[in-house]
Amino acid sequence: MSRVTLSRYLIEQTRSNNTPADLRFLIEVVARACKEISHHVSKGALGGVLGSMGTENVQGEVQKKLDVISNDILLEANEWGGHLAGMASEEMDNAYQIPGRYPKGAYLLVFDPLDGSSNIDVNVSVGTIFSVLRCPNQYLSQNESLNEEAFLQPGTEQVAAGYAIYGPQTMLILTLGNGVKGFTLDRELGSFVLTHENIRVPETTAEFAINMSNQRHWEAPVQRYVGELLAGETGPLKKNYNMRWIASMVADVHRILTRGGLFMYPRDAREPSKPGKLRLMYEANPMSFIIEQAGGASTNGYDRILDIKPESLHQRVSVILGSKEEVERVTAYHKE
């Protein structure tokens, strides 16, 4: 049986599920950009791409060279194709306007160009996270200037989401709203090839991912839940659990997606005015869409992530996602 490339898969989706051709082309362009980013990541010190730029992004985070390189690759790959009305990125303060010399399309692309980049200098897996939204009609005119409001849509409005993980293999995980597929980059062929047909989050779990160094700052429901996990067989859950923490959302969530468990980056008491660390638009929403399409669940402790109406482009949110039963347990603790 011949192997199914990403291009073939998307063409078949157009035929069988009426996936719009413009969306298909957009996903292919994003995938090509991810291949280029993968190349730069794999070169590391040989390509002179390690280290920081000496600048900060809108989040107040030090920008790595690869943050900027990856952001530029995604912008340059996608701006000219005629599929997008605009883009937004973790690395840019404001929405990116499609240059007037190019046609505007019907979609918006939101991305974290290099998630986990603080790990790049120590050769830990990093990735690219992206989300696709429809552009509101009032911004579709070639002469209409795009602003932040166009992007402020709840996660339920996503038409596609995915991430590329740059590890021992480069993989692309993708959902178009009808399940989750996994593609592995065949470097000899130069294409992403379908290798994981129907990814599902395992229902039972013995693993969780959280940064335990922040424990003293957590809210009581998270303290309670993690305490029960750590109590193991002698605790109320009557089961031993292992903790894994990579500090790269793509890597941690990829493990949860394939092996089950719970990923938690909850709000804490250090900055009470901030509802969390992770960004809603280009981290929590696409990852939550993927996890839900794979049979899992995602919450901020009180509400479903995908139901949250964004108030700003770089809004932060508490994130708890993974195996459905565990998410429901943590949510119940928050509501008691």
Swiss-Prot record:
Cited InterPro entries: FBPase_C_dom (IPR044015), FBPase_class-1 (IPR000146), FBPase_N (IPR033391), FBPtase (IPR028343)
Molecular function (Gene Ontology), one example: magnesium ion binding
Keyword Ligase annotated: no
Cellular compartments per GO CC: cytosol
GO BP term (any one): gluconeogenesis
Subcellular compartments: Cytoplasm
Residues that coordinate or bind substrate: D115, G116, S117, S118, N211, K277
EC assignment: 3.1.3.11
Record note on cofactor: Binds 2 magnesium ions per subunit.
Annotated positions binding Mg(2+) 1: E90, D112, L114
Enzyme class per UniProt: hydrolase
Key words, A-Z: Carbohydrate metabolism, Cytoplasm, Hydrolase, Magnesium, Metal-binding
Keyword set includes Chaperone: no
SUPFAM superfamilies xrefs: Carbohydrate phosphatase
Recorded catalytic activity of this chain's protein: beta-D-fructose 1,6-bisphosphate + H2O = beta-D-fructose 6-phosphate + phosphate
Pathway(s) served: Carbohydrate biosynthesis; gluconeogenesis
Binding of Mg(2+) 2, residues: D112, D115, E283
Record family assignment: Belongs to the FBPase class 1 family.
Complexes and interactors: Homotetramer.
Protein name: Fructose-1,6-bisphosphatase class 1
Organism ancestry: Bacteria, Pseudomonadati, Pseudomonadota, Gammaproteobacteria, Pseudomonadales
